[in-house]
Amino acid sequence: MAIRSYRILTPDTRNRSVSGFDGRVQLDPQKKLTSGQHHCGKGRNGRGIITARHRGGGHKRLYRQIDFRRNKEHISGEIVTIEYDPNRSAYICKVHYKNGDKMYILHPRGVMIGDTILSGPKAPISIGNALPLTNMPLGTAIHNIEITLGKGGQLARAAGAVAELIAKEDRSATLRLPSGEVRLISENCSATIGQVGNITANNRSFGKAGAKRWLGKRSEVRGVAMNPVDHPHGGGEGRTPIGRKKPVTPWGYSALGKKSRKRNRYSDASILRRRE
């Protein structure tokens, strides 16, 4: 969908832009495919202590139950609607299967209302179909990729995300992920063909701080604006430098270039090249 800009009437609309909804995108979900969600604490743990900073507030949302497994094998489904989902950057599709089931899936780019999709090992190589990696040709663009067989897609699910199948060898498939990481995944795991829709989601401009607060994101305060008790960069008279060779986090760790991934993880052997 194209990015829509506002006519300048107030300061907050001067630089604000949103994803343009056309007649195809609906806003009201089907009630049976939604559930309530309670954001307890907004970044706090069970004791009320902040464990994830810059979270809080936000508009109340209904969770749309998305089918990431795509395990309706050999049962064709028709795309009935394309809908907005406040819980993710991508749009979602409502699918009516021939056996009567109704489910939401991620909207693949190029899929239109009335199109038919299929899942299973014998599904054709077509956008929106889900099948195991072993049945896909090399160079296929995919999204919603499983890491563990049967668990459902976990990789390449954001708006505009797409991965590439670049090799298959010894019951493993080599994928190039959107982050630039190259890793091995079992070729029995399934994925959906195509790219996730709403590719212009990153081009929008919020225009004001309140638009971020609607999403449950609080402002980030600079360390030099804090007191010494709150941040290693804090304190001093006036515009004082941080007093260190390199910037650090609030807990004293290096803030630039330090790898934060834990060592000796079980998945290290599957990663052939780190992300860029």
From Swiss-Prot:
Q: In Gene Ontology terms, what is a biological process of this protein?
A: mitochondrial translation
- Residue ranges for the region (Disordered) are 225-276
Q: Which cell locations does it reside in?
A: Plastid, Chloroplast
Q: Which domain of life, per UniProt?
A: Eukaryota
Question: Record's GO cellular component, any one?
Answer: chloroplast
Q: What is its main location?
A: plastid
Alphabetically list the UniProt keywords: Chloroplast, Plastid, Ribonucleoprotein, Ribosomal protein
Q: Does the keyword ATP-binding apply?
A: no
Alphabetized InterPro entries for the sequence? NA-bd_OB-fold, Rib_uL2_dom2, Ribosomal_uL2, Ribosomal_uL2_bac/org-type, Ribosomal_uL2_C, Ribosomal_uL2_dom3, Ribosomal_uL2_RNA-bd_dom, Translation_prot_SH3-like_sf
List, alphabetically, the Pfam families matched: Ribosomal_L2, Ribosomal_L2_C
Q: Does the keyword Manganese apply?
A: no
The molecular function GO annotations come to: rRNA binding; structural constituent of ribosome; transferase activity
Q: Which family does it belong to?
A: Belongs to the universal ribosomal protein uL2 family.
Q: Outline the subunit composition.
A: Part of the 50S ribosomal subunit.
Q: Which NCBIfam families match?
A: rplB_bact
**Record HAMAP family:** Ribosomal_uL2_B
Please identify the protein, giving its name as recorded.
Large ribosomal subunit protein uL2c
Q: What is the lineage of its organism?
A: Eukaryota, Viridiplantae, Streptophyta, Embryophyta, Tracheophyta
